[in-house]
């Protein structure tokens, strides 16, 4: 696995960037400052919800489309990984892609090409 930005630094940068676009963003659970995994909870005003998890080079949407399944997923992940970060973004529409805006913590993406 290649070099990555420290999680705390990456989360703060994403919060600043997302907030500057008018999207509400907050940390629901602070994990390990250096190497914690990150889950992104997506919500919108119409009640839509979703979860993004990091994969090797970006983000994957988790199969959790209602509040109860999102909460259950988050609880399982917190038990499995105490270093986990959980960030919530309130968007206009959770079905719209935000994965590219989030980017990746990896510093070596060009090496795979």
Each language-model region and where it sits:
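Polybasic/polar functional segments that serve as interface/processing modules
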Residues: 1-113
């Amino acid at each position: 696995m290649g070099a990555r930005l420290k999680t705390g630094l990456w989360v703060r940068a994403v919060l600043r960037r997302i907030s500057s676009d008018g999207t509400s963003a907050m940390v629901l659970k602070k994990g390990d400052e250096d190497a914690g995994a990150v889950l992104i909870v997506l919500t919108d005003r119409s009640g839509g919800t979703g979860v993004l998890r990091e994969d090797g080079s970006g983000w994957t949407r988790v199969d959790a489309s209602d509040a109860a399944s999102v909460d259950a997923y988050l609880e399982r992940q917190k038990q499995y990984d105490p270093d986990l970060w959980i960030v919530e973004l309130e968007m206009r529409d959770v079905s719209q892609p935000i994965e590219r805006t989030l980017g990746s913590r990896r510093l070596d993406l060009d090496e795979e090409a």
